[in-house]
């Protein structure tokens, strides 16, 4: 894609690709049939729906392979990263009887922080892991916040404001050893640093693939 030409047309150079990215022409081309010819409901077992279902299945397999997921069925498509984060927090909290605590950091994306505020107003306890002036966190403090009432720990993989990359693999391992599910918002990490879900103890990595250049159906 030619961001230089795009910037010239709009009077500047676009440097905000971590927020959203110009659609790759190959992606536009790949999606065209599903915006015109193949418009059927993927859940319908007729001639209009079956090709769409096959395309979604293929896309799920591609994403699973890209992220190193063990099975394609582990991939859940949502409309956006915010919906994915909400799915992780709500599902973890309400599916585990007797567990009403969440461990997270004060530097998460608003999709996490605002949801935690809402859950807190409805009885959940949110334990915030301190972050230093340099954006670093303490693994020992993280471990100290985990207990038998912890439903989920959620720490972003890479911070969208500071650029800090957090030791998600180590955090997930600590959470696993305490029987706590671990979620990471990896929107800023995928396609920039190696991600292999088979090599981590991540329970859910739901809010990741939002960059338009990643998917080619």
Positions of PLM-derived features:
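Pyridoxal 5′-phosphate
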Residues: 1-217
